[in-house]
From Swiss-Prot:
Biased composition (Low complexity): 255-265, 925-939
Keyword Nucleus applies: no
Gene Ontology cellular-component annotations: mitochondrion; ribonucleoprotein complex
Compositionally biased residues, Polar residues: 327-346, 954-964, 1030-1039, 1070-1087
Keywords: Phosphoprotein
Lineage: Eukaryota, Metazoa, Chordata, Craniata, Vertebrata
Name of the protein in its database record: Selenocysteine insertion sequence-binding protein 2-like
Transport found in the keyword field: no
Amino acid sequence: MDRAPTEQNVKLSAEVEPFIPQKKSPDTFMIPMALPNDNGSVSGVEPTPIPSYLITCYPFVQENQSNRQFPLYNNDIRWQQPNPNPTGPYFAYPIISAQPPVSTEYTYYQLMPAPCAQVMGFYHPFPTPYSNTFQAANTVNAITTECTERPSQLGQVFPLSSHRSRNSNRGSVVPKQQLLQQHIKSKRPLVKNVATQKETNAAGPDSRSKIVLLVDASQQTDFPSDIANKSLSETTATMLWKSKGRRRRASHPTAESSSEQGASEADIDSDSGYCSPKHSNNQPAAGALRNPDSGTMNHVESSMCAGGVNWSNVTCQATQKKPWMEKNQTFSRGGRQTEQRNNSQVGFRCRGHSTSSERRQNLQKRPDNKHLSSSQSHRSDPNSESLYFEDEDGFQELNENGNAKDENIQQKLSSKVLDDLPENSPINIVQTPIPITTSVPKRAKSQKKKALAAALATAQEYSEISMEQKKLQEALSKAAGKKNKTPVQLDLGDMLAALEKQQQAMKARQITNTRPLSYTVVTAASFHTKDSTNRKPLTKSQPCLTSFNSVDIASSKAKKGKEKEIAKLKRPTALKKVILKEREEKKGRLTVDHNLLGSEEPTEMHLDFIDDLPQEIVSQEDTGLSMPSDTSLSPASQNSPYCMTPVSQGSPASSGIGSPMASSTITKIHSKRFREYCNQVLCKEIDECVTLLLQELVSFQERIYQKDPVRAKARRRLVMGLREVTKHMKLNKIKCVIISPNCEKIQSKGGLDEALYNVIAMAREQEIPFVFALGRKALGRCVNKLVPVSVVGIFNYFGAESLFNKLVELTEEARKAYKDMVAAMEQEQAEEALKNVKKVPHHMGHSRNPSAASAISFCSVISEPISEVNEKEYETNWRNMVETSDGLEASENEKEVSCKHSTSEKPSKLPFDTPPIGKQPSLVATGSTTSATSAGKSTASDKEEVKPDDLEWASQQSTETGSLDGSCRDLLNSSITSTTSTLVPGMLEEEEDEDEEEEEDYTHEPISVEVQLNSRIESWVSETQRTMETLQLGKTLNGSEEDNVEQSGEEEAEAPEVLEPGMDSEAWTADQQASPGQQKSSNCSSLNKEHSDSNYTTQTT
């Protein structure tokens, strides 16, 4: 026969209706049914007058079904059978014509083998494969249309199938068929190639010419042993490659069949892509719900038509590769829960969107099935390319090689990327799926790239934060005395260098291998497996699909959510404007600071800057900020005297400690990744707990949203963003706040710092727990966002109370540890300050004491005695100087003694005290100081005594300046004025010709011009001696001389006049003891004369 009879029978298909099985008596059916089944072979049986399709009724099939395992399809009988009965052809061919009543019965022929012998006989004359694929598919659909006419019979024979009688969509029977077939296989013995005869041989390419119609193949029950011996779950999913219409139909039967298995339809919202956990956790039947479409029936079709149908067959054989079998076997044997989800996705995969619950389930099983899903996606993906090929043999080989190659590449890339990522990257902590919501391939690709970038940025950020955690742990252990006192920043330099290398390598790979990386993220990265098979059509096989039928894909899928073609540009908020403005300022300061650091302090600060530079570069790229003054992780560079960052309310600096020491401690502890507003230690346990808590709440929220969006909006679990969190905190709706510790430092009014302080203040007022954990990017990944998130507010943690309580406990411990660490560091810093004060270099009387307070401040008179010593000699022997001064004071009046104490503490300042007079023009000031210094130097030249004399001079100067500080102030004023004078004189002296003296006094001072001439010094000495004699102001002169002697201590060493300071000191002491009252009375006059004399001396010189 040709296809003409087929077409003819299609026209006559309406006549099949009278032959409904129930219209015949059972006795008439028993005879023909018994003959073939009892004999085990139909070869010797006479054709029966009754149509064989009538024998498919339930009672007969059930009785004799087990005997039909042997070849029933003899050509003679099958060919002769229809001749006596004119209805034979009619019942057979209407299958192709999609006649509902007959097709209903043939739907179950696949399960009940009785009619197969007769049916197949009609088609034996067709030697060529039936190539009309789409007709075959339509026929299959037609076959499944009226499956519900026999629900009760099915229920009787196969009790596991439910008794649903309502009409179902096309394809809804397919899951039933697979379920029933599985049970039939369990009932009957293994079948030995029942279909191995000419027309039904299934496997090899040699049987191409003997393949029957696709419809018959789909209805064939007795399969080759390689297929029949497999369990249902082991069959491959060729349904994936059916036409798009078939894919769309497959979703509905899945929903209905799953509802038959006990899950309500509310649990399965195929349109929204939501599947409840109850659904996916069903028994093996549930696993077969969607896999059935793709698996068993298509396996039958493809195996029966191995060479007949072009791409259906190809995909079938391609998917029968061993990896699939192994995976499915694992599913069928033990891993039902996990693999069920994968296989269940196979049916939905073609629909192009996965469900949120599936994402969550996959998220849980991700670590176990990561490689499995990647291999599965690779197995299924290259098969999409098979659509282009018709040479099955050649493509078979190609497909195998392609699969292996792709998978190897995939594993290489995934392992490479994951190995290169930092050990504690959020891949190990933040395991959330990437929310690819679009169904358009191009947009999905862009979303995928964004997701990849977000993942890598999160990994980098968290690696930096983990370094910060290590630093804090070291500080904690150091505070507890567990480690030596090596500075933390030494180790951090290496860590930063390593991190920089990692980041550069990642960026290089991202630039060069963008495409493979995106593939890797889809399958391998733990937080990317939404379900790799589910994502496949849009991600990995995207090139094939795009070139093949991208239009069809785009049009066949309903868009989920709002998707704007052109995103509307958002106007920056007030906060964003402030942030952007300060960023620009910081960038400007970065260039200036960089130049300054490179020029002024090439050794010490340059090293600090290098250490911090990689982090600054990263921060510029990631968040747009650039602030070298932050000096991200090196505490040494953060020890600048004044940190302009407002002290956070939770930090120790706000606890009433007003000393600069506390603020410097805070500056040393905190960095760009651990800002000052944090008052707890960062640790991994808190990060993990926060991640789990947020993921749990997000899953709750999404699940409710899938069921009832209105209710979900009313019962939100989370809120993100500073503005939203602040708004809801004002409404007292927030139960917990999670803040990122690495928010950008924006100190302008209305900036980020102010907003964060407001949030923390409100949390304190409302007694809401606030936690500092993760980082901005990692926090965003926890809540399924690709953008960074600074603050997350929790409305309701019901359902995750254990995690929440654990988080609160960990936070309290971290806060206590932070306080201990700060206290220990403050104590340590104070100790170091006492030890290292002497070693700090000073310049022109400006002290650099621990509090960073300059000598300019009046209040620092008492607090700065040590650091005010300028000469190296005095730095090392300041205690001797104090003792000497005390001894001299004892010989003086009590008033002078008091003044001595105040000023003796600052012997280095006193050298400059005489110039305070010199708040006049430089010449005048120099006059007084030069006269005094010249006298001091002349005396020094006369006596040339050793440095102990210098110490005496210093003490005498201190006492003298106590009584007369050179600014016409008496003892009452002297202590305060002396402090002011200490700085100004030095500054003035720098400007004067006494650069020589200064140079000698301060060899380390930057202004060092040695232009001292012995003749000039001698003239100064002689003039100062004259003034001393005439004015009888030995004290004043001595004081000025002492100033000059201090400043010119080195000058004295170089010049031979070093001897005279001792003489002057003796004369000064004698004068001081002789006439303290005269000193007071004639302060101003003597000073004025000194000025004139000094001017004269300078002019003469």
